[in-house]
Amino acid sequence: MAGPEGSIFNASAMQIVQIHHYAEGSVTPEVDKLYQDDAVWIISSSFIIFTMHSGFGLLESGSVSAKDEVNIMVKNVVDVVFGGLSYWSCGFGFSYGDIPEWRNPYVGFGKFFYDPTRDYGTRETINQEGWSYASFLFQLSLATTASTIVSGAVAERAKLKSYILLGCIVILIQALPAHWVWDKEGVFYKKGVVDFAGCSAVHLVGGIIGLIATVFLKPRRNRFNEDSVHQMSSPTNALLGTFLLWWGWFGINAGSVWGITGGRWRLGARAAVATIMASIGGGATAITISFVKTKKLQVNFLINGILSSIVSITAICAVSRPWHALVIGSISSVFSIAVLPLLDRLHIDDPVGIVPIHLTSSIWGMIAVGIFCEEDKYLGSATNNRSGLLYSWSFELLWVQLQCTAAILIYSATTGFLALFLISKSPLGLRVTDYEEQIGADVIEHGLAGTNVARYVLEKPLSTRTFQTVTKAITKWKMLAKKKSRQKRMEAAKLKRQEEQETFTNGTAIANGNGNVLHHRTNATESNGTGAPKRSNGPAFNNQITPLAVSSTVSTARNGPSTGRRTESTAIEIEQPIEAVPPEVVAAAVLPPEERPGPSTNSNVSIEASVEKSPSSSTSRRSISIRSSPSIHTVSAISTAAPDSRPSTASATSIISKKSSKNSTVGKFVKAPAPRALSPPDNNPPV
């Protein structure tokens, strides 16, 4: 009789294979105290598995053409979104439904639209609820992985809407093999099949449907022409995706032992070591073959060798020895590289390598269990107390493994082909047109024309129509980006001007970009005893002057041709506010006599204007004075002298003097410059 420790191990072993069905019903104290820590292990492994979608996305986007990089990443996103919705509604129920009247060895029934009951009556029901959530999350992550495998097979050829529907159907197709292999009522579970981490129920299903899909869709345009060379758009992304998948498979294989308590942490460690040893064997074999065959290290050989070796070890990872994993991974790498020329010869266009990585490797992995499986005293129930051909010299386990592999291949291929056929005949359609394939899904499906599309246009010869369409899309994309950038710059400049204006008005100090403090003069406001000066647009705009009584003398002198400088001297007298100066007064100051309007009786402003010409120079000088009757209270003088590149005819004096000439039209076209904004002097300048 086994001791207490042995009974715990045996109880744990039962849970390892039966916890896939959450309602195990075991209520022994030994199992009860394992629930909590083991649930944490399962949930953590599920988180790691979800990161594999990033790896699939990078691997596939780096393997397809540049014009479809974004589209293939989007497909990996919808795999989780709509695939998860499909699994929640029906997939989990078909795999682990527990209604006795409807479930059978071939399909489960019940638990649709997953929502477990919350019965807090006993400890057993509480634990079962926790196991239910953990099991659902883990199985959901595995099911969406099977759907993601198919996305690489249909890359660049399937419509996005059609692929979303196909992904949901793949989830439902995968639900039945999961029931056969992992549910305690499953047909192959009862026969003693061994598949710890989804070699058959995940990778075999996704691989065979991917093969059927890529054959059904036919090769990409010009894929197998004599001058066609298949190149990765971004080998860097593909290698990064390989690393992420490498990391994620530790979560699948080590998490498939379903816990760490009761000695199962040793099983998790064994699965992790088997994973790394298989990848080492596969990678070393792929590198050797690449150097021998091509004298170079081919990136696709390296990726296929590593990933295919990990897939092949998933079925036996928890009971494998390190040298078992090394041999299994090496053989899987050979198969994955050997199948590549066969695919080219048969004109099977597999952009990402779904067939060598998932299909051939999963078949070999299931067969390897029947050869290398060793009975373990802690996992005796997992292998039904059977060993492989190498240890028992019996073909019994190998025969069960072959039966399971053949049944899943036939079922998945048939249902996958039926789904593809129905979708292709539906109004949605399945394959993109030749024109849409040339332009790329990034433009057609998402309206994107970024640098990846531009790079593809430069690298690939396109027809005139396609080139024009893509060029137009790229131009539109660049204009939109430039417009958005310009709007951001304008908004930033506007905010900066507002900040400076507020600082200028308040008289505070601000710091410029160099860290120096800028002191602004304080505007005259009513609070400090003076009225704020108001800016006028001048008579050229509204024919009126600001409501201030002004006494002004404007003197303009233009130097000779030797200097080309222009000097202005302006004297302004600010008086008490009076009514606006009538338009005819302003017109009399700037217009010739023949164009001046009649005198106004309401005007109390006098105008004096004279034009002088120095006898010693050709400089003309005009003095204009506008005065009003009230007494003067404040006088301020501002003198400015600055070079001006405008021609001399732009000044008001030149316009008036030249209007006297016959056939002169300068005054009709030259616009008087707007007056400058004036502010009273600061009697207390900053130190």
From Swiss-Prot:
InterPro entries: Ammonium/urea_transptr, Ammonium_transpt, Ammonium_transpt_CS, NH4_transpt_AmtB-like_dom
Residue ranges of the TM segments: 39-59, 77-97, 134-154, 162-182, 196-216, 240-260, 272-292, 299-319, 323-343, 352-372, 404-424
Pfam families recorded: Ammonium_transp
This protein's record includes keyword Membrane: yes
Gene3D superfamilies: Ammonium transporter AmtB like domains
GO MF terms, alphabetically ordered: ammonium channel activity
Stretches with biased composition (Polar residues): 549-564
Keyword field: Ammonia transport, Membrane, Transmembrane, Transmembrane helix, Transport
Protein topology in the membrane: Multi-pass membrane protein
Listed GO CC annotations: plasma membrane
Cell location: Membrane
Annotated Low complexity bias: 614-632, 648-665
Main location (coarse class): membrane
Annotated region described as Disordered, given as residue ranges: 521-544, 549-568, 592-687
The UniProt record lists the keyword Nucleotidyltransferase: no
Any one biological process term the GO annotation gives: ammonium homeostasis
Job of this protein: Involved in the uptake of ammonia.
PANTHER family recorded: AMMONIUM TRANSPORTER, AMMONIUM TRANSPORTER 3-RELATED
Family: Belongs to the ammonia transporter channel (TC 1.A.11.2) family.
NCBIfam families found in the cross-reference section: amt
Protein's UniProt name: Putative ammonium transporter 3
Gene label: amt-3
